[in-house]
């Protein structure tokens, strides 16, 4: 049986000679930390997109099926029960507030993608001001937490399987 290979997140093709070893190790640690946040929020975004799509398609199918079958059979019980189930599914989707969760997850993962791009640029030689940049990412983290972005704990095991093992 073949051992599954893990993916390497450090895919830089150039590291600037201007950086000290301490700066390189710090940038790699930051990259590792924010790559995990990026990946977890991206998976959360995909999960909520699929959940919303499933609820919407399911509710439409139930409502249309109930309406057609109820109209053909002239049986109001079928119309009410099947269409009612579709309306319940639509209500469930609205109560779960998937649209907001999708927006928040997308904001979080695109923000962290920008952080990863910045860190790669610093590794390639862009001027790196440690204090200024750490203040920036701290404010970004606090903003994402304050906005109430959905938790990403359910994907952490998969991240560890893909990138860490």
Regions found by a protein language model. Give the residues of each.
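Amphipathic alpha-helical interface surfaces
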Residues: 77-80, 84, 88, 108, ...
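Conserved non-transmembrane functional hotspots
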Residues: 2-61, 91-165
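Membrane-active amphipathic alpha-helices enriched in small hydrophobic residues
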Residues: 54-68, 81-88
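Membrane-interfacial hairpin junctions
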Residues: 68-78
């Amino acid at each position: 049986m073949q051992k599954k290979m893990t993916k390497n997140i450090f895919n830089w093709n150039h590291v600037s000679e201007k950086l000290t070893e301490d700066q390189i190790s710090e940038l790699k640690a930051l990259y590792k930390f924010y790559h995990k946040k990026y990946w977890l929020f991206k998976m959360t975004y995909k999960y909520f997109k699929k959940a919303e799509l499933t609820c919407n398609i399911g509710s439409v199918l139930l409502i249309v099926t109930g309406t057609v079958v109820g109209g053909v059979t002239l049986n109001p019980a079928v119309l009410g029960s099947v269409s009612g189930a579709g309306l319940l599914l639509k209500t469930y989707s609205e109560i779960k507030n998937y649209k907001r969760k999708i927006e928040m997850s997308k904001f979080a993962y695109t923000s962290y993608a920008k952080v990863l791009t910045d860190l790669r640029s610093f590794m390639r030689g862009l001027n790196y001001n440690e204090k200024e940049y750490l203040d920036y990412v701290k404010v970004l983290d606090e903003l994402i937490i304050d906005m109430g972005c959905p938790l990403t704990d359910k994907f952490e095991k998969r991240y560890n399987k893909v990138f860490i093992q």
